[in-house]
A protein has these predicted regions:
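Short, charge-rich amphipathic interface segments used for partner binding and complex assembly
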Residues: 37-77
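Intrinsic disorder/low-complexity segments in short proteins, especially the signal peptide
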Residues: 10, 25, 32, 56-58, ...
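N-terminal acidic leader/helix
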Residues: 2-37
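Short intrinsically disordered terminal tails
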Residues: 1-7, 74-87
Length: 87
């Protein structure tokens, strides 16, 4: 079974600003969820949260998602995603 990194644990580990927590959570759910309905709801939520953010904040949120995903891959014994050095 995969190791799971709880959202609060990830936010603390990577010091995600509270302003970005909602969109980072929604993006993570949209990527990780196996349930199509839940995935679509998460995408809609992410789009809603994105309306309140600047382009720089969106890029920052994306970089946190990549960092968290790579950390999850690492704790599950996988190598980091390629092409994400600048994220």
């Amino acid at each position: 079974m995969e190791n799971v990194l709880e959202p609060k644990e990830a936010f603390n580990l990577f010091r995600v600003p509270s302003k970005l927590e909602n969109i980072v959570t929604a993006l993570m759910v949209s990527i990780i969820s196996n349930d199509k309905k839940r995935m679509n709801e998460a995408i809609e939520s992410a789009e809603f949260f994105a309306l309140e953010l600047t382009a720089n904040e969106l890029e920052l949120a994306k970089s946190y998602v990549v960092k968290i995903l790579n950390h999850i891959r690492k704790i599950n014994g996988l190598s980091p995603m390629r092409g994400t050095e600048n994220a």
